[in-house]
Amino acid sequence: MPLYEHVMIARQDLSNTQAEGLIEHFGTVLSDNGGKLVDHEYWGVKTMAYKINKNRKGHYAFLRSDAPAPAVHEMERLMRLHDDVMRVLTIKVDEHAELPSVQMQKREERGDRRERR
């Protein structure tokens, strides 16, 4: 099956558990349509470069999936219809990277710097 990576931005007024619940919800959508959610990372609340739907911040999540194209199209369709999801980006990749994403690596480096002080 093809491999995909998705980045989702959810509204800032959601709690962290609600944002994680969105990830689980869309993972079940994939599994119901014959795919699977391989891995996901919650990047936290980040400030955006410009306002989207009058929001300056958003909950960012990164998902890796192994699913057929119709399952991904259905998940994207439901994400775009969901009121809590502001933006979705999906790309098809040849293989998933084993390491954490660049955003998570940056977070770990920042954590190391804070401990040194």
UniProtKB/Swiss-Prot annotation:
Gene Ontology cellular component annotations, sorted alphabetically: cytosolic small ribosomal subunit
Keywords: Ribonucleoprotein, Ribosomal protein, RNA-binding, rRNA-binding
GO molecular function: small ribosomal subunit rRNA binding; structural constituent of ribosome
Signal peptide: none
Gene3D superfamilies: 3.30.70.60
GO terms for biological process, alphabetical: translation
Record carries keyword Ribonucleoprotein: yes
A Pfam family this chain is assigned to: Ribosomal_S6
Parts forming coiled coils: none
Cited CDD domains: bS6
Physiological role: Binds together with bS18 to 16S ribosomal RNA.
Family per similarity comment: Belongs to the bacterial ribosomal protein bS6 family.
NCBIfam families for this protein: S6
The protein's name in its UniProt record: Small ribosomal subunit protein bS6
